[in-house]
């Protein structure tokens, strides 16, 4: 099994528990997307002809990308690698990025799995972690996502 992980090192804000490298400035986002596309092309020779079964957008917060940027990067993978007929394509997302309109938009793309960073349904925990969403928003986005996606995971932090 072969998969491609695409790291998106941007976030709207810093969560207090996060140790990952990221930037809250979006000034270089377009430049980074183009650099990722170049990296996808440059790494083509390392694939040994294996079929790509999964494409995973992780981060940071990949849901800060526009649908056009996501589609562009997926197209780069398809153009440069042998991709199975129905690959699992995951986008990590925060609830505050998943409006009803955005979920519908993503459902029309090749993304077929959402990994939603809810972290907690408790308001005190969310505030302490400096999350941008509240519990009601998390529940609403999860309910909305289930209308359009059959494959959803959520991140929860235990014992905060």
Regions found by a protein language model. Give the residues of each.
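Extreme N-terminal starter segment of soluble prokaryotic enzymes
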Residues: 1-4
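Alpha/beta-hydrolase
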Residues: 6-8, 118
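Local cysteine-cluster metal-coordination motifs and their immediate loop/turn environment
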Residues: 9-20
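Conserved non-cysteine loop/helix-boundary elements of the Radical SAM core domain that shape
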Residues: 22-46, 50-160
């Amino acid at each position: 099994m072969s998969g491609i992980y695409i790291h998106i090192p941007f976030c709207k804000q810093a969560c207090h528990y996060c140790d990952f490298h990221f930037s809250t400035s979006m000034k270089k986002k377009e430049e980074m997307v183009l650099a990722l596309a170049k990296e996808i092309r440059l790494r083509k020779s390392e694939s040994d002809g294996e079929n790509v079964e999964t494409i995973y957008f992780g981060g940071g917060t990949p849901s800060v990308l526009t649908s056009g940027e996501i589609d562009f990067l997926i197209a780069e993978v398809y153009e440069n690698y042998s991709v199975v007929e129905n690959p699992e394509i995951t986008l990590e997302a925060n609830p505050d990025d998943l409006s009803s309109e955005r979920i519908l938009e993503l459902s029309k793309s090749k993304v077929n799995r959402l990994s939603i960073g809810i972290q907690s349904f408790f308001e005190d925990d969310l505030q302490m972690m400096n999350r941008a969403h509240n519990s009601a928003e998390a529940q609403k986005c999860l309910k909305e996502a289930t209308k359009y996606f059959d494959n959803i995971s959520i991140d929860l932090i235990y014992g905060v």
